[in-house]
Amino acid sequence: MTLRLHDSRTQSLRDFVPLVDGRVGIYVCGPTVQSAPHIGHLRSALAYDQLRRWLTHRGLDVTLVRNVTDIDDKVIDNARRGQEAGGTEEWWALAYRVELEFSRAYSALGILPPSYEPRATASIGEMQEIIRRLVERGHAYAADDRSGDVYFDTASWPEYGELTRQRAADMEAAADADPRAKRDVRDFALWKGAKPGEPASASWPSPWGSGRPGWHIECSAMSTRYLGAEFDIHGGGLDLRFPHHENELAQSRAAGDPFARYWLHNGLVAVAGQKMSKSLGNSLFAADLLASARPVVVRYFLGSAHYRSTLEFHDGALAEAEAALDRIETFLDRSARRLAGTRFQAAPAAPDGSPAAVPDEFAEAMDDDLSVPQALAVLHDAVRAGNAALDAGDLQEAASLRADVSAMVAVLGIDPLADEWRTASDQPARRALQALVEHRIAERQTAREARDFALADRIRQELAEAGITIEDSPGGSHWSIDGE
C-alpha cells in the first residue's frame, strides 16, 4: 500500500511521493524557548517522531530538521520581567536554559534527536538574504519612518491565503509588529528595527538598520538552509497554520523557492474538555507529566490518538495508558519466559539487517495517514492472540505473535522492555517521591498564603538541597528533579 498523508494545503489525502527517490526531507517547527515545555510541545514533537520512525521502517533515508526559536519578543520580554523582579538572567541565557529543558523532555520520551536542530540566531545571514530577494522582487518594503522595520507586502502576492483558504479581505491584522509604518494591516514583519531599551545583544546589523528577524522568516531560512529550496514535508501544530505557516509559505514562494510539497498539522491538547492555554491557567507542564508516570507510559498516551485529532487529557488518561502498556509488557515478559530454552526462543533476524516485518494490517493503518489508533488495535489483538496461544501451549504461534508485537512496539517507540526505559521504571519509588514532594509544596503554599515567607523559603531550600527544583507560575507550583 502507498503511504498517504493529509496535506493541509490541499485539504486532502495525497499519495506520498518523495522529491528524491529513497530520501525524505522534513522540517518541523520547534519551540520558542521562552518558558518551560508543556504537554502540547511534547505531543507535537512525538507526532513527527512517529512519522519519522514509520518512514525509516519503510526503508527511506529521513532528514528531519527541528528548529529552536531562540530570539523572539517573548524571550526578550520574559528575561526583562525576570530582571525587573531582581534576576540577572539575560535573554540568551534564558533561551539556552529553556532549550535544555525541552531537550531533556524530548529525550525522556524517546523522541529521536533531529538530524539538524538549528537555532534562529545562527541563521541571521540566510534570513537577510531572503528579505533582500523579497525587496528586489517587489514583495517587501522597508518602513519609511526610519524605524528599520521591513514588511512583507501581502497585496503583492495574490496567492496569499492559499494554505488556510482565506481571502485577504477576511484575514485578521498581523500582530507581530508595530503597525505605524505598514501599508496594509495584514503586512507582517520580516525584520524588526531595534527599539530603545532593548538589549544591544538582541540586534544584528542589516542593510535596513540594526534589528532582529521576524518570527516567520526564521523558519523559511532554516528549512531551506538545511533541506534546500524545495523539500518534502513541513510539519507543526494546528495553532501554527495561521499566521505562521501561511506567512512562511507566502514569503518563501514570493522569494522564488518552491518550498514544502506537503503540509502536515498535528492537533492540539484539551485538558478536562477545555483547550489548553495559558490564559485559562490549565497548562500541563512536561516536568509534571513526566513525574506522574513512567516516560514510556507518557509516550504511549501522547501517541495514542490520531495525530490530527485533539488529544484529550483527563484524570484517568495516564492510568489507562499504563494499563494498556502493562498488557503489552506482561505478554512480552510471559512469552519470553515460556519460550526460553525452546527452539522458538529467538525471533529470526532478517538476513539483510532490515527492520523486522510488521503485520500487514498494522502497515495498512500506518500507511493510512499514520492511523496510530488502528495500528494500536492491531497490536493489542496480537497481544490477546499471543496470550491465548500460550494458554493453549502453542509455542510456535506464540513465538510468531511475539515477533509481531516486538516489531510493532519498536516502530512506535514504545517497547517496554527496551533499555532506554529501564532506568525510569521504578514506579513505586516515583510515586513515593511525588507524594512527598507534593506534600511539601502544599505546606509551602499554605505558608505563603499565611505570609510566612521565611517558612516558604526554607521549604524551597530544603527541596533544592534534595535536588528538587520548584518553578512558580500563575497556574501553581511545579517541580522537577535537577538534571531530568
Swiss-Prot record:
Q: Which SUPFAM superfamilies match?
A: Anticodon-binding domain of a subclass of class I aminoacyl-tRNA synthetases, Nucleotidylyl transferase
Annotated keywords? Aminoacyl-tRNA synthetase, ATP-binding, Cytoplasm, Ligase, Metal-binding, Nucleotide-binding, Protein biosynthesis, Zinc
Which Gene3D superfamilies does its entry note?
Cysteine-tRNA ligase, C-terminal anti-codon recognition domain, HUPs
- Look up the record and name the cofactor or cofactors this protein needs: Zn(2+)
Query: Motif 'KMSKS' region: where?
Result: 275-279
Identify the residues that bind Zn(2+).
C29, C219, H244, E248
Q: What is its EC number?
A: 6.1.1.16
Q: Which Pfam families match?
A: CysS_C, DALR_2, tRNA-synt_1e
Catalytic activity, reaction form: tRNA(Cys) + L-cysteine + ATP = L-cysteinyl-tRNA(Cys) + AMP + diphosphate
Entry binding sites for ATP: K278
What Gene Ontology molecular-function terms does this entry list? ATP binding; cysteine-tRNA ligase activity; zinc ion binding
Assembly information from the UniProt record: Monomer.
Q: Report the protein name in the record.
A: Cysteine--tRNA ligase
Organism (species): Clavibacter michiganensis subsp. michiganensis (strain NCPPB 382)
Gene behind this protein: cysS
